[in-house]
Amino acid sequence: MGKYNLILSEYLSFVYNSQSAVQIPIYYSSNPELEKRCIDFHAKCVDNSKKGLSLKPLFEEYKDVIDNATLLSILSYSYDKYNAVERKLVNYAKGKPLEADLTANELDYENNKITSELFQSAKEYTYSLMDPAILTSLSSNLNAVMFWLERHSNDVADANKIYKRRLDLFTIVASTINKYGVPRHNEKYRYEYEVMKDKPYYLVTWANSAIEMLMSVFSHEDYLIAKELMVLSCSNRSTLAKLVSSPMSILVALIDINGTFITNEEFDLEFSDKYVRAIVPDQTFDELQEMIDNMKKAGLVDIPRMIQEWLVDCSLEKFTLMSKIYSWSFHVGFRKQKMIDAALDQLKTEYTEDVDNEMYNEYTMLIRDEIVKMLEVPVKHDDHLLRNSELAGLLSMSSASNGASRQLKFGRKTIFSTKKNMHVMDDIARGRYTPGVIPPVNVDRPIPLGRRDVPGRRTRIIFILPYEYFIAQHAVVEKMLSYAKHTREYAEFYSQSNQLLSYGDVTRFLSSNSMVLYTDVSQWDSSQHNTQPFRKGIIMGLDMLANMTNDPKVVQTLNLYKQTQINLMDSYVQIPDGDVIKKIQYGAVASGEKQTKAANSIANLALIKTVLSRIANKYSFITKIIRVDGDDNYAVLQFNTDVTKQMVQEVSNDVRYIYSRMNAKVKALVSTVGIEIAKRYIAGGKIFFRAGINLLNNEKRGQSTQWDQAAILYSNYIVNKLRGFETDREFILTKIIQMTSVAITGSLRLFPSERVLTTNSTFKVFDSEDFIIEYGTTDDEVYIQRAFMSLSSQKSGIADEIASSQTFKNYVSKLSDQLLVSKNAIVSKGIAVTEKAKLNSYAPVYLEKRRAQISALLTMLQKPVSFKSNKITINDILRDIKPFFVTTEASLPIQYRKFMPTLPDNVQYVIQCIGSRTYQIEDSGSKSSISKLISKYSVYKPSIEELYRVISLREQEIQLYLVSLGVPPVDASTYVGSRIYSQDKYKILESYVYNLLSINYGCYQLFDFNSPDLEKLIRIPFKGKIPAVTFILHLYAKLEIINYAIKNKSWISLFCNYPKSEMIKLWKKMWNITAFRSPYTSANFFED
């Protein structure tokens, strides 16, 4: 058993170090004899500890248990309610506490003043601006750091340097916190006025960020960056991250490309040894210098110096340091402003009459034409999704807030809730449901607001619109997205691509006669100037489309959509400002509509096209690519002569002038070698990603539990690590120890072992080995997995009560009746289950389920009860396969060059040997014929799980299933009788298995699983035709080989002689594999 259990026991003796503290290990075994010994051992430990006797003799007596059984958990109890943190902290508080500069920020409350100066009383106080929003406390974080420091105080050589650097940084944190005292959190991990009143307001979130940074320090450069950001972020709570990361947009334009990867016709990355010189006009250097001067003005010293030293020769090798600074800057934490300031920010832009109306006109027309192009085909064909748009909207209605809390009746139960799905049900029950009327959002019904906080940017507001807006927009937006899916201009939506494809697209056309124009248009999207032309363009497009059809239902759908745009042109928002709720006329576009992403992309594409058409009046060039990705757009322009400094200068100034004619406050840059957009940046022909995910501060509080957050923390750590920001793994494990412990009573706590947290069950939190997803196949692993399966689904009385009410039942049957032509138990049950699952976001239901799960878990962690089950997990399948594989050593040469310099060595090595992939493996079943057939006639979208169940039914049943969803009987019977059906069986099984094995997550998404180099290492003699079995054997082999390579940086070859007799057995088993959701899978999904 790995490092985790070792750290766990050391951590327990570190935290509970008093005389009265006892730790009792609990073991289990799948072997009945040994299991008896485990139970005896536990009983005696409890007995001895009650009598105050030592446990040492028992460890000797039960050596067989300790050596051969598996650690399940550690039970720890300790009577001293510790203020141990304070006691230990004093030893580190030897330095000078930081003093915040109280004039560093423009907005008064963003200064790190003593809380009682910002908020005179508890009544005024709000924690929302400094809330770390994570279910772990500052004291735990301090404990985790001190634990690490104590553990490593005797390190030697290089390890000692790391220790010294971290100790030095922690001294700053400890001294500052010690001056004011450690803030105590309440049971919800919030910091109340009483605790904070005599302490600096941002102390907690600052300290969390500082700890996260210091635990990510390895080299001397890390130390300098961290120290500077730590010290300054104590005062500057507003602009620090922006100042530090601004230069990157120019730095990417300074490095020559000497060899790069480009996308070829087959959509693969292929190496090109082209050389492209970075052509940089003087003005660009002046702008960069100004940014560096601003950094110095803000008190930064080392970071600007590092940038200036790099500028001497602008080498790609040393660029990793620039990339590091860029990533680190985000770890100062979130900028959380008051809502009023976030909203007024957009309204401050002054109107000028002096704008180029012709350009606005062109922009509007381009939006109109794009909308028409996207929707023309579905509208002309009276697409069933547009005809049944209301039903489609209801089926995919989320359980997010509808803006206001209402009293709802479900049977005898009366509850208060803001959730959309519950409001819809209630409205239908009371006959108040009128999807044909889009409520106004004018001064009488102003829009309530949500918020989005991001490091290094201002807080943005989000509209919480009534559910009618969602229903009206859903179907149309889905059609827009499916058009964008096969349009390369829309980088974000382009079919199954990933960011590597977009990277190859840019580098492909870079040469001595081309330049790339890249613009960050986030300011434009939320500006008032955009509103009228944007909404009008959409309205005009919808009007044109309405004339292309005679179907009243399609016209109605388009009209409702149009109505949402008309209403939003006259929008008011409500902002709580202290006690009063202010109503403000809000003339800008904000997120919150279903169309936000799609419509912004359309608008940004129209914007860059408008700009390019103006530039074309003056220069002669060919536009090689135009791309829009979220808030950014970029284009590669090819001229008929080599690009000169003079040209870059002129084009750059012209582009900026053109944007300014539209009053668009955007950041437009021109370069010959690289770009920087929000999602990725390309420099020196290589691709980089910002590793900016905060670990110890969260953007907002959701309804995830501590276990979920431990999994999210680990997932964030992995993503950062892949992107070049590594936090000490021991620290992360210590956090997981803290966050997954379960309190039994005040003094009793249970700490799960590594086996519990890494086995893929509903409780999985992390992987024993970073980047490697293991599926345990030993007896003990399968035993514990079975045990956990028995307590996975917990009931909730509240949910059952709501679900058995007439209101709920009527709603579900209304959906079923509208959707189905004839009875279909699978679908009806599916809808009921989905609707019931949406109730989970209603806190009381969630808490009830959670409590039940925790108490079941407590029982299980003290004594696992395995149960015989006919459920088969992916582990069972792999366990059947494993014995037939024979391993031999092999070798693969490194044959591909690096294109993603930030990757960890072991992952980089694997890619360099087998190559990378530029596509997502299809794991949703949407490519199968049955899925296409259903979507041709119905608005219902079966999940991969449902398809997997349906495709293995008898042919007659499949036919009934299809017919009930509105597929014509003749099509259904043709389908079942054709070869396509048997291909589908294979396709869906394949997708399902890929889905189970998380092939599109973590670092697996980077590897080319179909690499011929990988295939060379696998030998499986061909026996009989069961493609599904061949598939699983090959996939298993590939994962084994890749996992081995990640772990050992060397290769193995696998030979498998799978008996024909076993094949049929395996094939049958493969049709009832159970999938489970765990905090770990949700965290991965959350990353998506």
From Swiss-Prot:
GO terms for cellular component: virion component. It comes from the Viruses. GO terms for molecular function: nucleotide binding; RNA binding; RNA-directed RNA polymerase activity. Its EC number is 2.7.7.48. Its cofactor is Mg(2+). GO terms for biological process: DNA-templated transcription; viral genome replication. The keyword Nucleotidyltransferase applies. It is found in: Virion. It is an enzyme of class 2 (transferase). Keywords: Magnesium, Nucleotide-binding, Nucleotidyltransferase, RNA-binding, RNA-directed RNA polymerase, Transferase, Viral RNA replication, Virion. It catalyses: RNA(n) + a ribonucleoside 5'-triphosphate = RNA(n+1) + diphosphate. Residues 501-687 form the RdRp catalytic domain. Its main location: virion. Interacts with VP3 (Potential). Interacts with VP2; this interaction activates VP1. Interacts with NSP5; this interaction is probably necessary for the formation of functional virus factories. Interacts with NSP2; this interaction is weak. Belongs to the reoviridae RNA-directed RNA polymerase family. RNA-directed RNA polymerase that is involved in both transcription and genome replication. Together with VP3 capping enzyme, forms an enzyme complex positioned near the channels situated at each of the five-fold vertices of the core. Following infection, the outermost layer of the virus is lost, leaving a double-layered particle (DLP) made up of the core and VP6 shell. VP1 then catalyzes the transcription of fully conservative plus-strand genomic RNAs that are extruded through the DLP's channels into the cytoplasm where they function as mRNAs for translation of viral proteins. This is RNA-directed RNA polymerase. It comes from Rotavirus A (strain RVA/Pig/United States/Gottfried/1983/G4P2B[6]). The lineage of its organism: Viruses, Riboviria, Orthornavirae, Duplornaviricota, Resentoviricetes.
